[in-house]
Structure formats: C-alpha cells, structure tokens
C-alpha cells in the first residue's frame, strides 16, 4: 500500500470553517501521518454539489487565514467560495505543493443514496478525483436533528483503515465514507455499500402564493419528509441503520461510448 507519510492532504467541507467536524477530521488526518492544510468555506455551503461559485471582489476571492482549535501549526484558511472551488483553486496554482488527496467533512449528517450528487462534501471529493487526486468524503449519520454533541470520533476511528483502502487504489479514486453517530465501541465492522435509490428523507417543495399587492409570485418552501420505503439491507442507508460504517466508491462525470449504436451519422446540408 502507498505510504501516507509523504502525502499532502487538503481538508475541506461544506459546513464551513467553524465546524468542529472539520477540526476533528484535520486532527485525525494529521495523526495518520499526512501533511495537512485546511481550506474551507467561510460560512455554511451545504447542498452546493460540485459548484465552483465564489464571491469575487475587485481583487479576486477573499481568503482569510485562521487558527483552528487543537491544530497548532496547521495552515488554515476561510475562503469565500464553495468547496469544489477551493479544491479546483488548489490545483491551479494557489497551494504549493498541490494536494495528493482531498479529505472532505466530517459532514453533519449522512451522505447516502443517489442524492450524494447534491452534497458539497461529496462534490469536493469528486472534484479532487477529476484532478487525478485521491478524494474522500466523510460523513456522520446524525439523523434529522443533529445532536448537541455528535460522536465525531465514530467517524475518525475508522479513518486509518479507510485511508489504507483508498491509497491501495489508483490516484483519482473517490470514496464516500459514512459512520453511525454512536460511541466508537458500539461500531460494527466496515462494510462496502451500494447507493440506495433514495436517502433517509425526501425534500417536498410547496408553492405559496403571494398576498395581495405582493411584489413576487409567491415563495417556494421546502421541508423534509421521512421516506416510507424500506432500504435494501446492502445499501448505505440499510447498513448504517444496522450500525455499520460504510464505504462506497463513486465515479464522476465520464463519457459512455455507443450512444449511436453503430449508426453512421452524416453531416446535414
């Protein structure tokens, strides 16, 4: 397996620079032997997927140096941009040396099912893969209402095993790792999981008409509703519910040959 001792890890997230989950992840990654640098959005950027949006002023995108709790000596930056923008910028001349891997999280809430497409945590890891780096998205299954004291250590406990798994594969590999929010002693064995067809909750959007004299056509209000279907026991949703940390390899955008089925297309005149 590849040695982690010479590798540089960029730690980011979509919950923002002030998330304790980010700090725990950076600390655990440093303990695993990586050269760590932290760069995360200056405020919450959940649900932005692989967006490369950034707030651009006259002089560019603002970067604020930060000192993070328990991370003395680790360079850290709050960036006024989305997680994938941070990853993209890191490979385009901002960070030297460039990262070898991007570790994104620890997200407050699981990233499961096909809805991982919309996760900023996962988007950062997928963007790393597109640049030929290793990518790892780390999430904690805290349920609908996050607890006051999440078990971040439940996610960090399995990181050495997941890092070994990741680094045994080719650069460009992206893994999504979810852990139940339990005491680490209660964790069951790590399992490979398929993506569920749905997550643990479904977003329902309601259109509310504007009142008399309103300047808009109304508002769209979204809310979460529990999914009634039972997940497959081999899916990420099912395995997490059974107390297993899960790992899933993700693939990003790629062309699929054969769309024309061998039909010869001639130019139209």
Predicted regions and their residues:
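A cross-family phosphate/adenosyl-ligand binding-site feature
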Residues: 2-9, 19, 23-93, 97-98
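Short beta-strand segments
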Residues: 12, 39-41, 104-107, 137-139, ...
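Short glycine-rich anion-binding loops that position phosphate/pyrophosphate groups of nucleotides
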Residues: 15, 44, 82-83, 107-110, ...
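Electrostatically charged, flexible surface regions
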Residues: 48, 150-269
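Alpha-helix C-terminal capping segments
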Residues: 90-96, 123-134
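Short, Asp-centered acidic motifs that coordinate Mg2+ and/or phosphate
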Residues: 101
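Glycine/threonine-rich flexible loop motifs
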Residues: 110-119
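Glycine-rich phosphate/pyrophosphate-binding loops
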Residues: 129-154
């Amino acid at each position: 397996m590849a040695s982690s001792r010479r590798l540089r890890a960029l730690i980011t997230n979509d919950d923002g620079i002030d998330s304790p989950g980010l700090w725990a992840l950076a600390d655990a990654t440093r303990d695993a032997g990586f050269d760590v640098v932290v760069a995360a959005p200056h405020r919450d950027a959940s649900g932005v997927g692989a967006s490369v949006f950034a707030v651009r002023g006259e002089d560019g995108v603002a970067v604020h140096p930060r000192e993070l709790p328990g991370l003395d000596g680790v360079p850290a930056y709050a960036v006024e941009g989305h997680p994938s923008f941070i990853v993209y910028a890191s490979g385009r001349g901002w960070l030297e040396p460039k990262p070898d891997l991007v570790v994104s999280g620890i997200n407050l809430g699981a990233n499961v099912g096909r809805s991982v497409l919309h996760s900023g945590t996962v988007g950062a890891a997928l963007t790393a893969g597109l640049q030929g780096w290793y990518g790892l998205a780390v999430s904690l299954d805290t349920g609908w209402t996050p607890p006051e004291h999440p078990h971040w250590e439940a996610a960090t406990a399995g990181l050495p095993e997941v890092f070994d798994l990741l680094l045994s594969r080719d650069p460009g590999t992206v893994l999504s790792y979810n852990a139940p929010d339990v005491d680490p002693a209660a964790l069951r064995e790590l399992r490979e999981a398929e993506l569920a067809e749905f997550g643990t909750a479904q977003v329902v959007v309601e259109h509310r008409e504007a009142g008399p004299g309103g300047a808009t056509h109304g508002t769209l209000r979204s809310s979460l509703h529990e999914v009634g279907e039972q997940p497959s026991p081999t899916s990420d949703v099912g395995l997490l519910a059974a107390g297993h940390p899960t790992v899933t390899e993700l693939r990003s955008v790629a062309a699929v040959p054969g769309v024309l089925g061998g039909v010869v297309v001639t130019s139209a005149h």
